[in-house]
Amino acid sequence: MQRQEQLKKWLAQQYPGDEIQLEFAAADADFRRYFRAIWPDGASRIVMDAPPEHIGTDAYIKVRDIFSMVKVPEIYLRDREQGFIVMEDLGKVTYLAALQHDERALVHRHLLLEALDTLVEIQKGSQPDVLPEYDEALLSRELSLFPEWFCAKELGKPLNFKQRQLWDAGVKALLPALLAQSKVFVHRDFIVRNLMLTPGAPGVLDFQDAVYGPVSYDAVSLLRDAFIEWEEEFVLDLAIRYWEKARAAGLPVPEAFDDFYRAFEWMGVQRH
């Protein structure tokens, strides 16, 4: 509550005399929160609260500028010391909501192809030494969430010795396959909850943890999304479409689709 009052005071200083209604919009898994600031005429902007002692705004601004070739929120105001940003409001309709509202395969295919076009645009700008490396340590850390968080904490059933041996053997087999993939910019959470339904192309959110890593990662995140499921034939068709688009754009995907899809499936094991 103290942070919210601090935020309201800051907004009043930035927009003196304006009657602004502030409503909660969303929160990330970390300390970052978002509010929707609404003016009497109906205009709105999104306000980010990112406490500088925990997370700050630097990573968000850096990746936002790197991904500016696609539809990311325009930044209007920033207070680095307090951890506040006022940015463009891309609306309330996520891809997930749109896909759940209209379940026709034709609609899903159209929206997902638009998302894949956006992904290819992001990847076309890839270059090394710009974003953190998605290396073995980071991949291993993500994989460790399954035994350490999901099994032990969420389910209350930590792996026994034999199960842990099997898990470790699986990880040992998986990591080389993932690390062998060519690298591009990776959004790292390119899922339907982080894409907004906006005219022409999806708005892209929650990109601040982007890295430089495996080329199939974001396509897998989108097409193997944990919050929505499609028939295997549908996913295969879209994976082919992505591979074709990536090849046409000169991205470092395998020349043979079979090789790409094998890498895609390996990445799916790590991702979900």
Where are these regions (language model features)?
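Juxta-kinase regulatory segment immediately upstream of eukaryotic protein kinase catalytic domains
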Residues: M1-I20
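ATP-binding glycine-rich phosphate-binding loop
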Residues: I20-F35
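Short, contiguous acidic/charged loop-to-helix segments that flank catalytic cores in large enzymes
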Residues: P51-H54, D209-A210, D225-E233
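Active-site activation/catalytic loop segments of kinase-like enzymes and analogous catalytic loops
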Residues: L145-E154, V215-P252, G268-H272
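Active-site acidic catalytic loop and adjacent metal/ATP-binding pocket
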Residues: F31-I38, V171-Y217, E229
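Protein kinase-like catalytic core scaffold
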Residues: I46, K71, I85, V184, ...
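Helix-rich C-terminal or lid/interface subdomains of diverse kinases
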Residues: H110-L113, A137-K172, A177-S182, A248-H272
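ATP-binding pocket architecture of kinase catalytic cores
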Residues: F35-L139, L145, C151-G156, L179-A180
